[in-house]
Amino acid sequence: SLSISSFDTMELRYYPNTMDAQNGVNVRAYMGRLLDGLKQYAEDFSPTENESLMLIGNAGLGKTHAALAIAGLVLEQGHDVIYVSSPDFFGKIEATRFDPSGDADTLLRTASTADLLILDDLGTEFVTPYFITVFYSLLNNRLGAGLPTIITTNITDLSLIHI
C-alpha cells in the first residue's frame, strides 16, 4: 500500500554488498543509485516530460515497492496516477468487454489519459489475442499523448517481446 511503500522504507541492506560478476558493479551500491534515480524521477515528475520506465527483475527485488513509492510522490504533487495489477486490470477489461454498461471503455479511457499509469506484474496475465490488442492500444494511446507509463515485470528474458 502507499502508506508503507515509500523511498524512505526501501531497505538497501536486503541487497547483497557484493560485486555482480556479470556487470562488475557492487549490487547494493547499484541499487542505491537506481533508487536515487527513481526518486528523482518522481520528484521532478511532469506528465509531458517524463519517459516511460520498465522495472525488470526477479520477484522480491522491490519493483512494486519502488513503483508505489513513485506513485506516492507523484500523487503528492497533485497529478493523476493509476496503479493497477496488470492481470487484474486486463482480466476486468476482458470480462466486461461485451457488457453494455461500457465499463471496459471507461477503464481504458481512464488508464489512457492518467498523468501516470503504473502496470504492475506485466506478463503474469493470461495472454490472448484480445489482451495483445488492448495492451498495444493502451500503450499506443499513451505514447501518442506523450504520457509516461511504468511497467513492472518478473520476466527477465526476451519473452516479453512475444507479447
Listing of model-derived features with the role each one plays in the protein:
Residues 12-51:
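Pre-Walker A (pre-P-loop) alpha-helix and adjacent loop at the N terminus of AAA/AAA+ ATPase modules
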Residues 50-65:
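Walker A/P-loop nucleotide-binding motif
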Residues 66, 70:
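Hydrophobic positions on the alpha1 helix immediately C-terminal to the Walker A/P-loop
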Residues 72-82:
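Post-Walker A helix-loop "phosphate-sensing" segment adjacent to the P-loop in P-loop NTPases
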Residues 79-80, 113-116, 145-150:
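Loop/turn-to-beta-strand initiation segments
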Residues 80-112:
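Short glycine-rich substrate-engagement loop in P-loop NTPases that contacts/grips substrate
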Residues 101-143:
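Conserved nucleotide-sensing/catalytic segment adjacent to the nucleotide-binding pocket
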Residues 161-163:
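Conserved small/polar residues in nucleotide/adenosyl-binding loops
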